[in-house]
Amino acid sequence: MSKYIFVTGGVVSSLGKGAAGAALGALLEARGLKVTMLKLDPYINVDPGTMSPFQHGEVFVTADGAETDLDLGHYERFLSTRMGKRNNFTTGLVYQTVIEKERRGDYLGRTVQVIPHVTDEIKRRIRLGAADADVALVEIGGTVGDIESQPFLEAIRQMAVEEERGDTLFMHLTLVPYLASAGEMKTKPTQHSVRELRAIGIQPDVLLCRADRPIPADHRAKIGLFSNLPEKAVISAIDTDSIYRIPLLFHAQGLDDLVVQNLGLHLSAPDLSVWNGIINALEHPEGEVVIALVGKYVGLTESYKSLAEALLHAGLRARRSVRFLYVDAEDVETQGTEILAEADAILVPGGFGGRGTEGKIASIRHARERKVPYLGICLGMQLAVVEFARHRAGLMNANSTELDPQTPAPVITLMTEWSDPEGHKAYREEGGNLGGTMRLGEQECRLEPDSLAIQAYGQERIHERHRHRFEFNNRYREPLAMAGLRYTGFSADSELVEVVELPDHPWFLGCQFHPEFTSNPREGHPLFDAFMRAAIAQRERDGSS
């Protein structure tokens, strides 16, 4: 039977429940437990797949093809467990399921209500997602007091009653602000948040108090007094320069000891050698590398969360600190590629729509002509093909049909048939629904010999995650190859081009898949490691330190 740790938040949103929960999960995993995590999102969208990155941040894609909250990226980076469709669900998905059951007659004519039907569906999905794990950490999105969160909070309250005593634990994340005008930290917001949580029947067992500085013992004692908790259960969750310090910060305050004790587990001390090694690499870089990330959503860097983390992982492994130049592609259109001059390497990530496209293409041309290392991911690969077609193959009006449906040279076109992660055929028509209609999830890719890709991965067959509707148009394979473009990665059936390279460039690679989704701080990712080595070599060629 699984044990459950429910993670809630109060005072304000975006306090870092996902990172905090994942850090605790890492500590429990370091004690030998099998840990999984779930994210429950209170919004009505069925999934975040069609939500604007400016509102929601990154959409994280799991191996089984789920479009999920970015917190699942935190979960996979901190834990060895791979997440899937069961690990993230929304109010919209819950209501969709309940309504479908009602239409089928599953409720036998009963009046369908939030309690018990919606809450029962939430509990069913929690238990399903926790199956086979020793401990499941369940993060409730939003904050206590939100109307949208109430069914989820009621469901976990009921679970605490239904599960065996000692099999559930409530961890509440709050804010303890410092008021400069008063010169002190204020505990009242946390007291009110806990009071609101207790009013709906949930008594927290642990408080994680976010603050920009350590919380004094007398403040923690005061918070504990008004929350019915001992001082040791009030943990300082202070700001840090890297989320990978959080497991060690929590362990130093005894959080994992407290949780293990409350859950009635008898375990040995955690093996934190991996996390100590990560922090050692973080604190002792041997140089700096500057990576330009040219994108559409740089106004909210959370849109590229997994990508930034993957580059940081590569930097850790190469003993380099990574400095990002987040470049708005539209700024390249108005200011020119001179704003990329400082970059040791250039990356164009995935994205949708036409805004900023010409700026990305100009950045790719800059990387190609100046011999600057380039990595294009998803749309970044597609636009590399467009740029090459225009300026090397003589197809001056080349484009993607996503960006120009009437282009006379559609080198990138809509994909209408593909295989899903289970091997079943999937189809999409022009004008169909946007939600859930992309090629999603882990797919096999076959790499060509004597290529940058196979040098990076060290094997012919790899598996990477996808999220795209458009693909390389095979009608243009031969003319672009004759102009010098090399295809070095293909889908398992050889129908789809998945990796392109330029043999006359030191390091230029575009991939249709998203390698950032499988990188973690323990093992990194071979493609980002290779990209980082190329960036370091470029910096050394330029004579920078």
Swiss-Prot record:
InterPro entries, sorted: Class_I_gatase-like, CTP_synthase, CTP_synthase_N, GATASE, GATase1_CTP_Synthase, P-loop_NTPase
Control of this protein's activity: Allosterically activated by GTP, when glutamine is the substrate; GTP has no effect on the reaction when ammonia is the substrate. The allosteric effector GTP functions by stabilizing the protein conformation that binds the tetrahedral intermediate(s) formed during glutamine hydrolysis. Inhibited by the product CTP, via allosteric rather than competitive inhibition.
Active-site residue list: C378 (nucleophile), H514, E516
Known EC number: 6.3.4.2
Positions contributing to L-glutamine binding: G351, L379, G380, M381, Q382, E402, R469
One Pfam entry name: CTP_synth_N
Keyword set includes ATP-binding: yes
Pathway assigned in UniProt: Pyrimidine metabolism; CTP biosynthesis via de novo pathway; CTP from UDP: step 2/2
MF GO annotations: ATP binding; CTP synthase activity; glutaminase activity; identical protein binding; metal ion binding
GO terms for cellular component: cytosol
EC class name: ligase
BP GO annotations: 'de novo' CTP biosynthetic process; pyrimidine nucleobase biosynthetic process
Binding site for UTP: S13, K186, T187, K188, P189, T190, Q191, K222
Region of interest: Amidoligase domain: 1-265
UniProt: CTP binding residues: S13, D146, I147, E148, K186, T187, K188, P189, T190, Q191, K222
Other observations noted: CTPSs have evolved a hybrid strategy for distinguishing between UTP and CTP. The overlapping regions of the product feedback inhibitory and substrate sites recognize a common feature in both compounds, the triphosphate moiety. To differentiate isosteric substrate and product pyrimidine rings, an additional pocket far from the expected kinase/ligase catalytic site, specifically recognizes the cytosine and ribose portions of the product inhibitor.
Binding partners and assembly: Homotetramer.
Role summary: Catalyzes the ATP-dependent amination of UTP to CTP with either L-glutamine or ammonia as the source of nitrogen. Regulates intracellular CTP levels through interactions with the four ribonucleotide triphosphates.
Protein name: CTP synthase
Organism classification: Bacteria, Pseudomonadati, Pseudomonadota, Acidithiobacillia, Acidithiobacillales
Gene designation per UniProt: pyrG
